């Protein structure tokens, strides 16, 4: 916005007399040019035209996929189709039973079977595909739950078995330790008994030696005491014994002298033993 200033020069006032009109025309031209693409010669793109076309086509495909996704989201798990602002159109009980029976035959939906089911049940093929997709998801979830329950039961069973095995192992270890202690105690008892028997044997041997030596000593002591008590009788008995022994010696010497005299008077061949053959022949002649 321009304000009139009387102090400015006249030339400046003339140049700025119609500035708003030129600005307005330029703004209108720019507004009209926004709706149109700039016209540039093709050689300036250097092959970029195909890229721009492909990009525009990809954007269109993304938009169509998004719309299709929205349409699929409008379908419920039971295949009911809901439009914006409309209520769900639920499937009939017969349709659900037929779809369940077909799913039991095979959870994978082929294009031909999808079309046949759509015609037979009066449904759209897209509804059939979405129902099968949701049904497979529920089936997988239930299968995972069943597998989880089965694995959990197996885990609990293995856990209890492991606990029982650990308890049994502890029991066996306790029994082994008790047996080892018992063997050690028995070995110590046997060792003590052997040592005691050895000590007893040594004491008995020593006592027997002592007992054997004691009678000899007692006999000699008794003899000495008897000699001391009866010295005359012991001497007379000893004298008689000596006289008897001397008499026997004299008799033996007289006998020896007698035999020696006979040996000297008789010839040597008289005492020779007769020949057994001679006696035998003499017996035959008799």
From Swiss-Prot:
Q: What is this protein called?
A: Homeobox-leucine zipper protein ATHB-20
Tell me which Gene Ontology terms the entry assigns under biological process.
response to auxin
How is this protein annotated for GO cellular component? nucleus
Q: What induces it?
A: By auxin.
InterPro entries referenced in this protein's UniProt entry, alphabetically:
HD, HDZip_class_I_plant, Homeobox_CS, Homeodomain-like_sf, HTH_motif, Leu_zip_homeo
Protein family membership: Belongs to the HD-ZIP homeobox family. Class I subfamily.
Known tissue expression: Widely expressed.
Q: What does this protein do?
A: Probable transcription factor.
Task: Give the Gene Ontology MF terms in alphabetical order.
Answer: DNA-binding transcription factor activity; DNA-binding transcription factor activity, RNA polymerase II-specific; sequence-specific DNA binding
Alphabetically ordered keywords of this record: DNA-binding, Homeobox, Nucleus, Transcription, Transcription regulation
- Report TM segments: none
Q: Its gene? A: ATHB-20
The question of whether DNA-binding is a record keyword is answered with yes
Key word ATP-binding present: no
- Name the DNA-binding segment ranges: 84-143
Q: Region Leucine-zipper: list its residue ranges.
A: 144-179
Where can this protein be found? Nucleus
Disulfide pairings: none
